[in-house]
Amino acid sequence: MKKIGINDFTFYNYPTGITASPDGKHAAIAVVNANEKDNTYDSCLWIHDTESKKTRKLTSGKKERTFIWLDNETLLFTSDREKEYAKKVKDGEDWTCFYKISIYGGEAQFAFAVPYKVTKMQLAGTKLVLGVKYDYNKPDFAHMEEEEKEEALKAWKDEKDYEVFDELPFWANGQGIVNKKRTRLAVYDMETGDAKIVSRSMTMWRLLDRGRKQGPFSFPAIIQIRRMYTRALRCIPSPRTRWRLWWSREI
């Protein structure tokens, strides 16, 4: 029997996020595989026909992982194909681009972009409920005027050679530094193009695939919201200075 090699995991495909179309005739899947050369993971979307039992590749941009069904024949997904927004991201701004594609083929069409780093989304009528990564240590460059942004960007880069930790935990396995970083809740209106964060400051939200109707929405967003707590660190003077850890509610 051949022994398992140290690089064998790079040869496997990892299907994730399988989601059925509203009519149940198709299923979309994000297939992830390791890119050893670039030290990252590539991801493309595949379509499975539940009647013919055939599965085929739909996208090939290597960055397509987050997606939803808009109807029985159309997917909305995130990727980074727009040069204009790629430059903004390189300059320090947070943007996520969205695309539409027919499951029967053809080129994906750019739909819109939001000034947040989106990790998850759910459809709620004509609105999208978004889970976004938010870094309170980083200035909101996307909402600044050019001159203000240049000054803030310079100051931010000058401080990148050190990190300030004032929370516990400040590090998480597989995530790196998590100090002052939260998953916040945002809503994008696909009719007006308005996008805004609706969760309270410094509150951690979790957007699930399935849940009950709950939260500050009058439209039928299928979400479940979990309020998180953070731990605070306190120094207690004594002959041997110690650190005491306790739970504090931030909201």
Question: What residue spans do the PLM features occupy?
Answer:
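Solenoidal tandem-repeat scaffolds enriched in leucines and small polar residues
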Residues: 138-141, 175-211, 215-229
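Conserved beta-propeller blade repeats
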Residues: 11-27, 61-78, 84, 115-127, ...
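Acidic/polar residues at beta-strand termini and the immediately following turn/coil
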Residues: 21, 35-36, 49, 102, ...
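Beta-strand-rich domains and repeat architectures in extracellular enzymes and scaffolds
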Residues: 7-43, 179-181
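Multi-bladed beta-propeller domains
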Residues: 1-14, 47-65, 89-94, 98-117, ...
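Predominantly five- to eight-bladed beta-propeller fold
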Residues: 85, 89-95, 134-186, 233-234
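Short glycine/acidic-enriched loop and turn motifs that connect beta-strands
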Residues: 33-37, 81-86, 134-138, 223-227
